[in-house]
């Protein structure tokens, strides 16, 4: 074979090889393009994301034709971003979070009713509190129950947790001032993010109050609000068992560093304290002696809602993904790693949950709580409570005046919201 013919054959062979590679690459691109893509927006912390990703990876291994991506967003960014995107006909297929976002999303008509998408027999496996119904429709299916506050205590400093407000104050004084009751020890008996209204709720309920009635009207100008405000101000200014100032981060650091014996914090914090090497206990918040009522927190399931704009070709896979993430083994994995309360009824009665001290006491606290309202008016109430509550702490307003002003401002904000 002459040189020119050899070159010709070589060139033709090379051309076929390149063409084959191009076709193969094009086929891969088409395969990637043709995969069903599902996106989940959430506001969960890093350790929750790690568990979720492991579960998503298992789902994608079972279903290679589907690609699922999780995307973290801060709470306000998620809510406003989802509203804007969904109103424009876009956004993630699934939005995950606490139940209080359901009211605003339903008002905008940007999430789908779920009761006809999932079989009632399948739904019956889960705690009814984890199924968020609003205005006659099911809008969220939760895999985690709680998002609630409890009393967390350092067992080295507090061997036995208090069960009443009087015991809380007594232990707090001993930790803060020592046996003689006068010399500061350099630590506080108790700390928490008490300047925020959400963290005020346990004492409001302990004195017999709540934020709204069944019709969504604020119920802040009450004796319960006044007494709860007085209690918090007293343990700070008279008993001096809590810091003079404390936001969430300050309280968290004080407790982690052993400079506070107890902290009021949510179920999201427990795994972090354990990983930091603290020997912690979790206990129900105390009973108020004068009322005989337990300090109850707002309880909010965290779960899945579906975008109103979900394309028909993705519906099958979105439903399959939610069913997969709700499986007993996946909820158990989350419970073991994160100490979250599962919504699967059989898991709630399982040996692991019943024998784990943290989860057992978490369940008791949940039973003392009330579901967080999902109506949009709740946001107006939070915003109305904050300035007067902080005025009481600053000493510029009496508890009585603050309760009155909270009510007036909440009613005004709700009127403005509904105009």
Regions found by a protein language model. Give the residues of each.
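Conserved N-terminal structural module of periplasmic/extracytoplasmic solute-binding proteins
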Residues: 2-104, 110, 289-292, 313-317, ...
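Extracytoplasmic "Venus flytrap"/periplasmic binding protein-like
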Residues: 58, 62-126, 133, 156-161, ...
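Extracytoplasmic/periplasmic substrate-recognition and gating elements
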Residues: 62, 67, 234-238, 242-243, ...
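Hinge/lid segment of periplasmic solute-binding proteins
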Residues: 99-149, 160, 165-171, 185, ...
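Short, solvent-exposed loop/beta-turn-alpha elements that line the ligand-binding surface or hinge
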Residues: 115-126, 180-189, 209-229, 275, ...
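Long, aromatic- and glycine/proline-rich binding clefts that accommodate carbohydrate-like moieties
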Residues: 129-131, 335-387, 391, 415-416
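Extracytoplasmic/periplasmic solute-binding protein
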Residues: 139-149, 169-218, 260
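Glycine-centered hinge/linker elements that transmit conformational signals in sensory
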Residues: 171-173, 215-245
